[in-house]
Regions:
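Conserved GHKL (Bergerat-fold) ATPase module
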Residues: 1-187
Length: 187
């Protein structure tokens, strides 16, 4: 599924793929289809899982492939730490295979992949907040741990997503920080 173009895939195909690959009966909240050809080739799908209770396993699984051949789960050097809660599949034929993990940590190419994934996650969240704030609010309790941890771990991610972090106001309604501060600025 990840090798297809995103507009060739249906929601039902994404959900079925998620159930089969991750053996999870709960539907994911939403997903991001990665499809990049330049400056490196990267395809994949990242799912935001639904976390129902504090007892749910919040450990994700990111399966790394090279030319559709499975390589490993949860390569921390490729996936930013705060996104290790996600579930997904990433296929990167350009990734060097015959290197140690310590070499991967210092590889500029691997860092670019990690930054690209972080940017795509931030773009998806910002886009959702701007175009479908109701859905964003509905998902907030499940996605806020990802976002808050990401803000602590990644300064660029924090700078990008900062205005889209939600807080409850005194009326128990979700507001972004700029929305909460707007009445104060008017005074």
């Amino acid at each position: 599924l990840w090798t297809k173009s995103p507009n060739e895939c249906t929601d039902e195909e994404y959900k079925e793929f998620y159930r089969k690959v991750f053996l999870d009966y709960k539907e994911p909240l939403f997903w991001i289809h990665l499809n990049m050809d330049y400056p490196f080739n990267l395809k994949g799908i990242l799912y935001f899982p639904k976390i129902n209770t504090e007892y749910d396993s919040i450990e994700g699984t990111i399966k790394l492939y090279n030319n559709q051949v499975f390589i490993a789960d949860n390569i921390k050097e490729v996936i930013p730490e705060f996104l290790m809660l996600l579930k997904g599949v990433i296929d990167c034929p350009d990734l060097p295979l015959n290197v140690s993990r310590s070499a991967l940590q210092n590889d500029g190419f691997v860092k670019k992949i990690s930054e690209y994934i972080t940017k795509k996650v931030a773009d998806k969240l910002i886009g959702m907040c701007k175009t479908d704030k109701e859905a964003y609010e509905k998902y907030w309790d499940d996605i806020s741990p990802f976002i808050k941890f990401g803000c602590l771990k990644d300064e660029k991610f924090c700078d990008k997503i900062n205005d889209y972090i939600l807080f409850k106001d005194i009326n128990d309604k979700y507001q972004t920080l700029p929305e909460l501060l707007a009445p104060v600025a008017d005074d």
